[in-house]
Design a protein with these regions (language model features):
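Surface-exposed, charge/polar-rich loops and edge strands
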Residues: 1-357
Length: 357
């Protein structure tokens, strides 16, 4: 029954709280004595990205200084709200992005000349390094620089962010005399400059051709795209280009001029594919709920698309990755990114930094 599972869930959240407290008591987690920022560097396959670990303001989120590009699901939020609320802590940071700033970049470069506080390679081969910035001048320089940045974007972690904000609002209700400086007014984040971020493509695989033969399907595709065969796997090299795998053959698709759009959402490659192929030809109206389509993160490679087509699918599309600039443009326009349009890699590690409130 749902009542029994609610009790079970409460026990799970309580267990998380107890384990966190034990880890604090036994010195696994150490509370910082001074006001500091941390520089957090992740290296994957020789590519490095460096962010700043900080707390973001729930007011900035509510006032849209922190911009979103995805709707959240209430059920996914509730789980995270309960977890954060029961633990009185955020253990997984929100992945935020901003337009690169010279002052912040200089402070980060300076910090990286020191010895890191942490340096380890995780089991998945991703290298994590952390430096601390605690000198008063540097902390103030970074704080002032961020104060002047009026657009910050959620790259990944919309559910975590929405949940952290809702817990903060709960605490405000419980403490009507709040000043706005209490820790519950802030949530744990890592902020990355746009130029450091890598978005990987999110590829598509489809279960059937909606009653069309391969020939009929290709004929219809040719109305909107130029199509040429390829003897090797196709990873698109530019926007407006798509790889297609069908009948054990790869093709390069290039969108014709008339289906391109300058609209921040309709102009995205994932939207071009959805609006000109998936919906009209294959009858996939809502890719979020349609069981005939599946999504494969770019990290898994093109061989995975071939494997799926040998297995439970008949058709695959390899995408050109969405750029961070495209994501910013969608968020700036107050619009939503289409489902499964960005795959951020590497993922931030949970439990490395914890924000208690």
């Amino acid at each position: 029954s749902s009542a029994a599972s609610d009790v079970y869930k409460r026990q799970v959240y309580k267990k998380a709280h107890d384990m966190l407290m034990e880890a604090i008591d036994d010195g696994t987690f150490i509370t910082d004595k001074d006001k500091a920022y941390y520089v957090y560097e992740l290296t994957m396959d020789g590519r490095t990205q460096t962010g700043i670990v900080a707390c973001a303001s729930i007011d900035d989120y509510l006032n849209n200084v922190i911009k979103k590009h995805e709707n959240t699901r209430a059920d996914k939020e509730l789980d995270r709200i309960n977890h954060v609320d029961t633990c009185s802590a955020q253990t997984g940071p929100i992945f935020l992005a901003y337009r690169a700033n010279a002052v912040i970049s200089a402070e980060v470069a300076k910090a990286k000349q020191e010895k890191p506080v942490y340096s380890f390679t995780a089991v998945d081969g991703i290298r994590h390094k952390v430096w601390k910035i605690s000198s008063k001048e540097s902390v103030e320089a970074i704080e002032n620089a961020f104060a002047g940045i009026n657009q910050i974007y959620i790259a990944d972690g919309h559910h975590r962010a929405a949940s952290a904000v809702k817990v903060g609002l709960r605490r405000r209700e419980a403490n009507p005399g709040y000043t706005g400086n209490e820790e519950f007014n802030y949530f744990l984040s890592v902020l990355f400059p746009d130029e450091e971020l890598m978005i990987m493509p999110y590829n598509r695989v489809v279960k059937d051709l909606n009653g069309l033969s391969e020939e009929e399907f290709i004929t219809k595709i040719k109305e909107k795209f130029t199509v040429s065969g390829s003897s090797t796997q196709v990873a698109p090299s530019k926007k407006g280009e798509f790889g297609m795998y069908l009948g054990k053959k790869w093709y390069i698709l290039t969108a014709k001029e008339e289906i391109l759009s300058s609209d921040p959402v309709d102009g995205l490659d994932v939207a071009v594919l959805q609006n000109n192929v998936l919906e009209p030809l294959l009858g996939i109206h809502d890719p979020k709920t349609d069981k005939r389509i599946d999504f494969v993160g770019g990290i898994r490679g093109l061989g995975e698309l071939e494997r799926r087509c040998d297995n439970d699918c008949v058709l695959a599309f390899s995408m050109y990755a969405t750029s961070i600039g495209e994501l910013f443009a969608v968020a700036d326009a107050g619009l939503l990114m289409p489902p499964k349009s960005t795959w951020f890699e590497p993922k931030l590690r949970s439990g490395l930094f914890i924000h208690r409130f």
